[in-house]
Swiss-Prot record:
One of its GO terms (biological process) is translation. Belongs to the universal ribosomal protein uS15 family. SUPFAM superfamilies: S15/NS1 RNA-binding domain. It comes from Cellvibrio japonicus (strain Ueda107). This is Small ribosomal subunit protein uS15. PROSITE patterns: RIBOSOMAL_S15. CDD domains: Ribosomal_S15p_S13e. Part of the 30S ribosomal subunit. Forms a bridge to the 50S subunit in the 70S ribosome, contacting the 23S rRNA. One of its GO terms (cellular component) is cytosolic small ribosomal subunit. It holds the Pfam family Ribosomal_S15. PANTHER family: RIBOSOMAL PROTEIN S15, BACTERIAL AND ORGANELLAR, SMALL RIBOSOMAL SUBUNIT PROTEIN US15M.
């Protein structure tokens, strides 16, 4: 279910502010979004996988907290990120 190293590196390269930036909210949200999308595809085939569903809900909550933090600290960055990732908010 996890992202491959190449997928992670591509996401980090796209959203990082400076080289080696893996901790900024944009990078963290983008990685969580990719993991969430991958897990959602998993649940199409495995409807009864409740253990993984718990992990999915945890990731969604973590992403929500990061997005709330970013919205409070820098609204234009928040708006650009959700538009780029295609999130509904």
């Amino acid at each position: 279910m996890a992202l491959s190293a190449a997928e992670k590196a591509g996401i980090v390269a796209k959203y990082q502010k400076v080289a080696g930036d893996t901790g900024s909210p944009e990078v963290q949200v983008a990685l969580l979004t990719a993991n969430i999308n991958k897990l959602q595809n998993h649940f199409v085939a495995h409807k009864a996988d409740h253990h993984s569903r718990r992990g999915l809900i945890r990731m969604v909550n973590s992403r929500r907290k990061l997005l709330d933090y970013l919205k409070d600290k820098d609204a234009p960055r928040y708006s650009a990120l959700i538009q780029d990732l295609g999130l509904r908010r």
